[in-house]
């Protein structure tokens, strides 16, 4: 009972922060890739790639909840963490902007499959309530932030643990590289959709990556440090085990 109360308190804190982001006036920069920015063929292609990931995520989510119903509150906490961090925007490139992703914690606790669902829910609410991203571009944003970024973070986490690195170092690398991988994919998405007239898609991807890096590298480092702090608090309060879930 005490454990569930702690989780509910943490989740309510995340919800309060999310509501604050909704009521505080914000400048109208689009979060992620904004609605209507991608050509229809690319928007559809990314949606077709994202749908099987959603199906797999639902299977994983159902299995986790069936095995331990108390995980629902921890899942809500991870979802709130993703929502709050990914709603902090730093304008970077026309049609998109830099921000933390917040997926590292959920990746460590539940694996990348569940993050596809959490990320999709977050992106949907941000598109509908905050005008961040969009419905037509949700497939592209979901593939970058909720699928490929988390998969990279998960692989880094597993390799770091097998290499015997300190737990805090492994958490930091997972969160930071999941963030950077997200923006690498976003750069590719924008680059192939809008190739450079002279250098082609490759040149366009490099340009997008170069501009994103100016803000995203320090943001990713900060996200890694914050995730370490949150993970450390969850373990100290015995909300999770040291090994994660």
Curated annotation (Swiss-Prot):
Signal peptide from the UniProt entry: 1-30
Gene Ontology cellular component annotations, sorted alphabetically: ATP-binding cassette (ABC) transporter complex
GO biological process: cobalamin biosynthetic process; cobalt ion transport
Keyword Methyltransferase: no
One Pfam family in the UniProt entry: CbiM
InterPro entries documented for this protein: CbiM, CbiM/NikMN
Top-level division of the source organism's lineage: Bacteria
Keyword Ligase appears in the UniProt entry: no
Intrachain disulfide bonds: none
Keywords on record: Cell inner membrane, Cell membrane, Cobalamin biosynthesis, Cobalt, Cobalt transport, Ion transport, Membrane, Signal, Transmembrane, Transmembrane helix, Transport
Pathway(s) served: Cofactor biosynthesis; adenosylcobalamin biosynthesis
Transmembrane segments annotated in the record for this chain: 36-56, 73-93, 105-125, 137-157, 169-189, 210-230
Subcellular location field: Cell inner membrane
Quaternary structure and interacting proteins, as annotated: Forms an energy-coupling factor (ECF) transporter complex composed of an ATP-binding protein (A component, CbiO), a transmembrane protein (T component, CbiQ) and 2 possible substrate-capture proteins (S components, CbiM and CbiN) of unknown stoichimetry. Expression of just CbiMN in E.coli confers some cobalt uptake.
Stored HAMAP family: CbiM (MF_01462)
Family: Belongs to the CbiM family.
Function: Part of the energy-coupling factor (ECF) transporter complex CbiMNOQ involved in cobalt import. The complex confers cobalt uptake upon expression in E.coli; can also transport nickel with a very low affinity.
Protein name: Cobalt transport protein CbiM
Organism, scientific name: Salmonella typhimurium (strain LT2 / SGSC1412 / ATCC 700720)
């Amino acid at each position: 009972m005490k454990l569930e109360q702690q989780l509910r308190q943490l989740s309510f804190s995340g919800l309060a922060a999310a509501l604050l982001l909704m009521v505080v006036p914000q400048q109208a920069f689009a979060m992620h890739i904004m609605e209507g920015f991608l050509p229809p063929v690319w928007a559809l292609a990314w949606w077709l790639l994202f749908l099987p990931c959603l199906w797999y995520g639902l299977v994983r989510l159902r299995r986790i909840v069936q095995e331990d119903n108390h995980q629902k509150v921890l899942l809500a906490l991870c979802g709130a963490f993703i929502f709050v961090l990914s709603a902090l925007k730093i304008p970077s490139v026309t049609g998109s902007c830099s921000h933390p992703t917040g997926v590292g914690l959920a990746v460590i606790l539940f694996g990348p499959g569940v993050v596809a669902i959490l990320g999709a829910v977050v992106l949907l609410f941000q598109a509908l309530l905050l005008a961040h991203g969009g419905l037509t571009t949700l497939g592209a944003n979901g593939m970058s932030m909720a699928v490929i970024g988390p998969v990279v973070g998960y692989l880094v986490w597993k390799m770091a643990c097998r290499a015997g690195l300190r737990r805090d170092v492994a958490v930091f690398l997972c969160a930071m590289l999941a963030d950077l991988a997200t923006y690498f994919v976003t750069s590719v998405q924008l680059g192939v959709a809008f190739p450079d007239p002279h250098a082609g898609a490759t040149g366009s991807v490099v340009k997008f990556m170069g501009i994103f890096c100016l803000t995203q590298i320090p943001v990713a480092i900060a996200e890694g440090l914050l995730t370490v702090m949150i993970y450390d608090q969850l373990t100290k309060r015995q909300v999770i085990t040291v090994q994660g879930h």
